[in-house]
Amino acid sequence: MLPVLRSDFSNVKIEPIFEEMVDFDTFAKSDFRAVKILACEAVPKSKKLLKFTLDDGERKDRVILSGIHEYYEPEELVGKTAIAIVNLPPRKMMGIDSEGMLISAVHEEDGHEGLNLLMVNDRIPAGAKLY
């Protein structure tokens, strides 16, 4: 059995949980998938945006933009498997269509915002649906 690793989160603040409930049918419309990061690059003229080229297991490369450059350098993410919601309507940012949203965990620690892109085991294939 592997030991359980614990971190000290006593200095961490998290956002309160939404009080408004979402019915199951609305939630079930959200399509969360494992996506393999094929390429990642900084978006010119943007301090925050990274452009991800992703394998979503179904079609040609999917492009998603995410404002996480403050937390990650592009090269450290290539080859990783992340989680995305893939059935959002395309949204144009900096002239580029973003076809979904990568999922991150956000918290505040010692007065600074922290962000972690949700990544899963690389043995999970691109396109695997999350329930």
Sequence positions of predicted segments:
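Phosphate-backbone binding interfaces of nucleic-acid-interacting proteins
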Residues: 2-131
